[in-house]
């Protein structure tokens, strides 16, 4: 009996030691970026300045090539932690092929692009995408940088962890920017959750125009898993102050990305499906009067990943779109239906004119 008791106590003690050690390791290695820092820059040796007033954009959360049509995800009620290698390769090949076909677009704002992560098998997705877009500068800002994520504890701890992650936002641009900076969003989860979670941010690139004005392009990815929208409210307040200050200086502002919330006055359940348990928030209608929310209300941009994609039942909505300052004229905006083949998000293309 004493032997059994010692064995049980030993197992409990070992588990406690590993758990505490994991928290210490996570805390010591926690990614803690400053409020503002230069983005990782990969400029071209020779590239034109911005001269045309009519510009094209594309936004897309590529889901680290891990959330294609056949995948689900444990944090959304599914079972999978990461895809099989062949599935990841196929998802990424599809995303890369599509983006290569759109290389004439001036600006491509991408989210959930991995640089080195277990979930994407160590592939530097940003560098491979850059090779397919040889006429574009590219800039990277990390928003998910963790040495080791132990979850999920299912069926047992450390059996199938997320592991290491380094991923974030990438902006590709044909015109030459004068600067590219990462701006840290305020707010975070409490300890210890925050040491294993994303550090949300936006990636800003600036382009000189005539008359000392600038075009300010913002690539943003706002919080998910945010009960009550507390984190998103803080992020949106910061973004509002920031873009208003830029507009009041006479600059042109275009912000796009994955907002993890629907645009004002858009019915989140426009594409009604059997899965209706999701409570999707809208950005308040009075957020920025006089500014333009550019989205395609006829094409869903996001699907829920509790199960693999079923066009007949999977809940879909619009959470990927653009915000334009009053001096930017919307010419067209179009969601691109790829049937969620490569990601749980779909691209959205935009054309604008600077007034």
Q: What would you call each of these model-derived segments?
A:
Residues 2-135, 140-156, 161-166:
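N-terminal, active-site-proximal structural segment of metallo-dependent hydrolase catalytic domains
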Residues 34-36, 147-214:
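A well-ordered secondary-structure block
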Residues 46-58, 66, 169-181, 197-219, ...:
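Beta-strand-turn-beta hairpins that frame and shape the catalytic cleft
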Residues 56-62, 88, 94-122, 172, ...:
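Active-site beta-strand/loop signature of hydrolases that rely on acidic residues for catalysis
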Residues 64-65, 113-117, 144-147, 177-178, ...:
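Solvent-exposed loop/turn segments at secondary-structure junctions
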Residues 79-85, 113-116, 185-194, 221-230:
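Surface-exposed cleft-lining segments at the edges of enzyme active sites
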